[in-house]
Amino acid sequence: DGTLACTLPPGDWTVLRVGYRALDRQNGTGTRLGKGLECDKLSKEALRIHWANYVEKTVKALGPGLAGPNGPLRTVLNDSYEVGTQNWTHGFERTFAEHAGYAITPWLPALCGRVVGSVAETERFYRDFRLAVTDAFAANYAGEMRRLAHACGLQLAIEPYGEIPSDDLLYGEHADIPTAEFWAKLDSPHWVRQAASIAHAKGRRLVAAESFTTNAQEGRWQNTPWSMKAKCDWVYSEGLNRIIYHRFAHQPWTSPARLPGMTMGPFGVHFDRTQTWWKQAKPWLKYQQRCQFLLQEGAFVCDVAWYCPAGYLYINWGHNPHKMPVPVPTGFSYDFVSDTTLAEMRVENGELVLPSGQRYRTLVLPEQAFELLPASRAGVARLKAAGAEILTFEEAKGVLAARAPDVAWNDRAAKLNWIHRRDAGADWYFVASPRETPCRVDVSFRVAGRVPELWNPETGEVTKGVPY
């Protein structure tokens, strides 16, 4: 009946009543009859109910041949996470005990902002609590969704960033197609390197992105292939190799009176047959086709694996990766690697090698102020004992700057970016400039004993005998 009956020792006591409830967040894009509370992201059972009443119904309605690897419906995409965080679910006390090795009940006052034991002990509990939520979200939401998708013959794509109560890399590693996002505005932030790092580490061929997103000020039918090209080249050089236009809308109307048709409000480049330059878009599409084909081939050549433990990326960059300090000097490539990727690494001829075949020359650790967990310290020690080069965040730039870069150019004001891939004895570099105007520089590549060729993705022309 809500009455507490107990005998307490002498002294002053505060009685805390601790409970949990559903988040007051509803799906933002549902139809009038499709609105409701967001699914519990820490519960496999809740996700199965949601899946059975949404995706599975769609797959069954389409029937054999229309949903699956050869049908028009091939992929389920988890968009950027924008529905608020979550830190509890039914039975989470058992999940926490399995993860942390101790009961959560004595520590519940800490979740109400109180110190339990000492400040240091309470901080350690917070760390264990966050890690338990992190792993539960990645496994019970993304991991279970991937299992359900595969059971329906579908692939899972994930945009692993936003308000997620998890680690971006751990969450995204469950994707068959790691997916990013970039906006049409040239200097806007993007998350391509994060998705590309996951793909390289886990052996995923495709790195996709929600591409050329806009708001009302940047959209409004103002974008053209010319205005989009510089940003497109830049994200290609960050690791992207599949464009997903935001947005391409079905336009069922033929009457001019119904133009411009379905627009998805103010968001996104209007990429469909109602565009004024639609009939002239073939060269733009052929350009992207040629770029993406080559960027999907071969293996990524990378100097540095930058170890980012759970929570590190979000703590350092929040929602803007451009603000993150990078320990790698210009001319050297790098990937972000997670806790699970670190555990999978082995050393071969002094290089760090992953089961996917991805190789790195150097492992760079987080700043010394970022405390590593015992398992992480043991993993780093194992690799160092096997002969890997491991540098601290603070020393990495100085050590690497004394070496030959993979790419160098004679005009630092040019601010170029590039990506290097290799296959069957051939090396190819895609070089990008952030400018919308021509840029002339002399570029050097860390390749010897080869004769260069220039491949033009605008025309498909290959020029041999390039001066070098």
Each language-model region and where it sits:
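Carbohydrate-binding surfaces of carbohydrate-active enzymes
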Residues: 57-75, 79-468
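Mature N-terminal, pre-catalytic/accessory segment of carbohydrate-active enzymes
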Residues: 1-72
